[in-house]
Amino acid sequence: MTRLHAFNREQLLASARGELFGAAAGRLPNDPMLMFDRITEIREDGGPHGKGMVRAELDIRPDLWFFGCHFIGDPVMPGCLGLDAMWQLTGFFLTWLGAPGKGRALGCGEVKFTGQVLPDAKLVRYEIDISRVINRKLVMAQSDARMYVDDREIYSARDLRVGLFTETGSF
């Protein structure tokens, strides 16, 4: 089977329902927690580490759910949602490779926020660079990531870790 190298929103929502890669595969979260509208490129090689990369985008609109509650009178996208998007994309990479299991964020080394996403922004862009993939009894990916708003880097994270687990009862 030939792998796709880009995904639209409908395909990403199909992943949330278990329809894109099958019921046993990892799933993206559904709306409103799916934090990107499309994956513009995904490769199992490339990136600075040569281990793979994912590029994705989120269209910013003033009516996005988080602007109405974070904060009243001072709307800003919560930084943790951008970080979660980076974990979502790292886990999606493992699922796209064909690894089975449910995705779980396992941590990260360093996170920096140097800007914010406001309702008048137009586009958030994510760059995920895979630095390590383990596909044995433990299935895990490690990545370095950046988030841009309107082409300005505002978040960075190093050593993001996501695992896929076939059994999560004792996790």
UniProtKB/Swiss-Prot annotation:
Keywords in alphabetical order: Cytoplasm, Fatty acid biosynthesis, Fatty acid metabolism, Isomerase, Lipid biosynthesis, Lipid metabolism, Lyase
Q: Name one GO cellular component term.
A: cytoplasm
What residue intervals traverse the membrane? none
Please list the reactions this protein catalyses.
a (3R)-hydroxyacyl-[ACP] = a (2E)-enoyl-[ACP] + H2O; (3R)-hydroxydecanoyl-[ACP] = (2E)-decenoyl-[ACP] + H2O; (2E)-decenoyl-[ACP] = (3Z)-decenoyl-[ACP]
User: Which pathway features in its UniProt record?
Assistant: Lipid metabolism; fatty acid biosynthesis
Catalytic center at which residues? H70
Predominant location: cytoplasm
What are the subcellular locations of this protein? Cytoplasm
Enzyme Commission number? 4.2.1.59, 5.3.3.14
Q: Which NCBIfam families match?
A: fabA (TIGR01749), PRK05174.1 (NF003509)
- Assembly: Homodimer.
Q: What is this protein called?
A: 3-hydroxydecanoyl-[acyl-carrier-protein] dehydratase
Give me the gene this protein comes from: fabA
